[in-house]
C-alpha cells in the first residue's frame, strides 16, 4: 500500500469533508504527533479573491496561543492545494455530547460557556472573528475541555463566511444583522452566537427553530424566544441580554465578564506566554506557485515589480478606487506609502536597518519586507508589510500596510519609521520649502 505524504506528514483517513475542503488525520513522521490536515483547493481561494483575507487571518491564528482555541501549527502548499496543519482534538464535538446525553447541567453548561467566552474574547483581541460559531465547531479534548475550531478559517468558502452561505447553511445561530444582508460587526455577531450556544447547552434544543426560513428569520429578527422554567433567573437574564436583536445595545464580552451568573465558579484560563513564530510558511503558501518556481530556478534578480498606469491610479492616495468597495473608517489608516529616488537595494537595506533599530524582526523576499514583533504594550503581535515598486526608471514607491495590530499603533510606527528614513524619502520641492520655513520660524521663537 502506498502511503501518501505531504512534507513531513503522513496522511491517513478523511475525518471531515466539505464542498471546497477536506480534513484528514495525519502524523508528523519526525515527532510522531497526530495532527489534523485541512486541505483547501488553491484555485477556489484565488477565484473568490480571498487570498489576502485568508492569508491575514491564518497569519494571526498561527500566532494565537490559547487553551480554548484549536492551534494552527503551519501551512504547506503545492501547485494546486494549500495544507493547513491543525491540532488534532480527540474528544469529538460538543454537539455530539448534547445529542447523546441531552441538555447539560447548569454548572457544566456554565463551564463550557466560560471557556467559549475566554477563547472568543482572546481571538477578538487579535482582530479575528469566527462568524460561524455553533456546537459543531466546538470540540472537546481528552480532558473534556472546550476547543474552538475553525477560528480564523471562517473566511474559507466551506465555512460559510458569506452572508448568502451562512443564510442558506445554519441560520439558527446567526445574528439578526447578518441575516438582514447589511454590514455587521464580527465581534458583536459572534456574541449573539455564543448566546444561542449557551441556550442550547442548557435546554438541549434551539431557541429559534422553525420548519420554514421566513418564519425562522422573522423570529430571529425580533428575538422571539422563551427560556424554559428550569433556567436559573441569572441565566435567563444573561441570555436575554445576549440575544438582543439590536447590535448597538447587545451586551459586550466585557459586560458578560462582570455578570453575576457568569462569575460563579469562574477561573480565568492560564494564557500561554508569547513566543516568536515564523510566518514564512504562510506567506510562501499563498504566493503564486509560478513565482515560487521562478525564484527556485535561480533566475537573476530583475528588480522590483513595475507598476503600470492603472496600478498607480489604484494606489494613488488622491484617487483610491479601493475606497469604492471598502468604506470602513480605518481603511485609509492601515495603508501608507512614500516615494524614493534611491536604488531599490539601498531603500530595502535602509528600511531593514531602521526596523531593526526600532526593535523589530525583519524578513525580506523579492523586494517585500515583513516587520514584526510585540506591540508597544507587549500584549499582542504587531506586523507590517512593506513592498518596493518601480514607478519610473529612477523612481520607486514603497507601499506599507498594517498586517496585525491596531490602526493607532500602526500610525505611530509609520511616523517614527519615516522620520528615520529622511535620507531616502523624496519630498516635493514645495513641501521641502515649507519644512525649512517652519523650522526657521520655530527657531526664531
From Swiss-Prot:
Please name the CDD domains in this protein's record: CIPK_C
**Gene3D superfamilies, per this entry?**
Kinase associated domain 1, KA1, Transferase(Phosphotransferase) domain 1
In this chain, where does the modification Phosphothreonine occur?
A: 166
Write down the InterPro entries for this protein, in alphabetical order: Kinase-like_dom_sf, NAF/FISL_domain, NAF_dom, Prot_kinase_dom, Protein_kinase_ATP_BS, Ser/Thr_kinase_AS
Listed GO MF terms = ATP binding; protein kinase activity; protein serine kinase activity; protein serine/threonine kinase activity
Instruction: Locate the active site.
Output: 132
Q: Which SMART domains match?
A: S_TKc
Instruction: Tell me, in a sentence or two, what this protein's role is.
Output: CIPK serine-threonine protein kinases interact with CBL proteins. Binding of a CBL protein to the regulatory NAF domain of CIPK protein lead to the activation of the kinase in a calcium-dependent manner.
Q: Which PROSITE patterns match?
A: NAF, PROTEIN_KINASE_ATP, PROTEIN_KINASE_DOM, PROTEIN_KINASE_ST
Q: Supply the name of the protein.
A: CBL-interacting serine/threonine-protein kinase 8
So where does ATP get bound? Answer: 15-23, 38
Source organism per entry reads Arabidopsis thaliana (Mouse-ear cress)
Per the database record, which ranges form the NAF domain? 302-326
Q: What is known of its domains?
A: The activation loop within the kinase domain is the target of phosphorylation/activation by upstream protein kinases. The PPI motif mediates the interaction with the ABI (abscisic acid-insensitive) phosphatases.
Q: How does it assemble?
A: Interacts with CBL1 and CBL9.
Span of domain Protein kinase = 9-262
Name the catalysed reactions. Answer: L-seryl-[protein] + ATP = O-phospho-L-seryl-[protein] + ADP + H(+); L-threonyl-[protein] + ATP = O-phospho-L-threonyl-[protein] + ADP + H(+)
Q: What class of enzyme is it?
A: transferase
Amino acid at each position: 500500500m502506498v502511503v501518501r505524504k505531504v512534507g513531513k506528514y503522513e496522511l491517513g483517513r478523511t475525518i471531515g469533508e466539505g464542498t471546497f475542503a477536506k480534513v484528514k488525520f495525519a502524523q508528523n513522521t519526525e515527532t510522531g504527533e497526530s495532527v489534523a490536515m485541512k486541505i483547501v483547493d488553491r484555485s477556489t481561494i484565488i477565484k473568490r479573491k480571498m487570498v489576502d483575507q485568508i492569508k491575514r487571518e491564518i497569519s494571526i491564528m498561527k500566532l494565537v496561543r490559547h487553551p480554548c482555541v484549536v492551534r494552527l501549527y503551519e501551512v504547506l502548499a503545492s501547485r494546486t492545494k494549500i495544507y493547513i496543519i491543525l491540532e488534532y482534538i480527540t474528544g469529538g464535538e460538543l454537539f455530539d455530547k448534547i445529542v447523546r446525553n441531552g441538555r447539560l447541567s447548569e454548572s457544566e453548561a456554565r463551564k463550557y460557556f466560560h471557556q467559549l467566552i475566554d477563547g472568543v474574547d482572546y481571538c477578538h483581541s487579535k482582530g479575528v472573528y469566527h462568524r460561524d460559531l455553533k456546537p459543531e465547531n466546538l470540540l472537546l479534548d481528552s480532558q473534556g475541555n472546550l476547543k474552538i475550531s475553525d477560528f480564523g478559517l471562517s473566511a474559507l468558502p466551506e465555512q460559510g463566511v458569506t452572508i448568502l452561505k451562512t443564510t442558506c447553511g445554519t441560520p439558527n445561530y446567526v445574528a439578526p444583522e447578518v441575516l438582514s444582508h447589511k454590514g455587521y460587526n464580527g465581534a458583536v455577531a459572534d456574541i449573539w452566537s455564543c448566546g444561542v450556544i449557551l441556550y442550547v447547552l442548557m435546554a438541549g434544543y434551539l431557541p429559534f427553530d422553525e420548519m420554514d426560513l421566513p418564519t425562522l428569520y422573522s423570529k430571529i429578527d425580533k428575538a422571539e424566544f422563551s427560556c424554559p422554567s428550569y433556567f436559573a433567573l441569572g441565566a435567563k437574564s444573561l441570555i436575554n441580554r445576549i440575544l438582543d436583536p439590536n447590535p448597538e445595545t447587545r451586551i459586550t464580552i466585557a459586560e458578560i465578564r462582570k455578570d453575576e451568573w457568569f462569575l460563579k465558579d469562574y477561573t480565568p484560563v492560564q494564557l500561554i506566554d508569547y513566543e516568536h513564530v515564523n510566518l514564512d510558511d504562510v506567506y510562501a503558501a499563498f504566493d503564486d506557485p509560478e513565482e515560487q518556481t521562478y525564484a527556485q530556478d535561480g533566475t537573476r534578480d530583475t528588480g522590483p515589480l513595475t507598476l503600470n498606469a492603472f496600478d498607480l491610479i489604484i494606489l494613488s492616495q488622491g484617487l483610491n478606487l479601493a475606497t469604492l468597495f471598502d468604506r470602513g473608517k480605518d481603511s485609509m489608516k492601515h495603508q501608507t506609502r512614500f516615494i524614493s529616488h534611491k536604488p531599490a537595494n539601498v531603500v530595502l537595506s535602509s528600511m531593514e536597518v531602521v526596523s531593526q533599530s526600532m526593535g523589530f524582526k525583519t524578513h525580506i523576499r523579492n523586494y517585500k519586507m515583513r516587520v514584526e514583533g510585540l506591540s508597544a504594550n507587549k500584549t499582542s503581535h504587531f506586523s507590517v508589510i512593506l513592498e518596493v515598486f518601480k514607478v519610473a526608471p529612477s523612481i520607486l514607491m514603497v507601499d506599507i500596510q498594517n498586517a496585525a495590530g491596531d490602526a493607532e499603533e500602526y500610525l505611530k510606527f509609520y511616523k517614527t519609521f519615516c522620520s528615520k528614513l529622511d535620507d531616502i524619502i523624496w519630498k516635493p520641492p514645495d513641501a521641502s520649502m515649507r519644512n525649512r520655513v517652519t523650522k526657521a520660524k520655530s527657531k526664531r521663537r
